[in-house]
Design a protein with these regions (language model features):
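Small, basic N-terminal interaction modules of short regulatory proteins
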Residues: 1-76
Length: 76
């Protein structure tokens, strides 16, 4: 069975965190300016990603942003 996608937004830090499954300890790797993949340091599995300066990137924008990652999703 797949894992749920969980999101949290830190207004003070202007950071959107998206976790695949429950949030867990991870190493962050910047893949583009302000876009970070979170990787489990033991398994190497991607466990989420973070977007810094979220308002800067998305407020008032009608542009679609593309991250350099691929995902497989399913509806239960």
């Amino acid at each position: 069975m797949g894992k749920e996608i969980k999101m949290a937004y830190d207004d003070a830090g202007d950071i959107l965190d998206i976790s695949i499954g429950d949030p867990e300890e991870a190493i962050s790797r910047e893949v583009e300016e302000d876009f970070f993949l979170r990787v489990n340091p033991v398994s190497g599995e991607v466990v989420g990603f973070s977007i810094l300066n979220f308002r800067k990137w998305f407020k008032g924008s009608k542009d679609i942003k593309t991250l350099p990652i691929k995902a497989e999703l399913a509806v239960p």
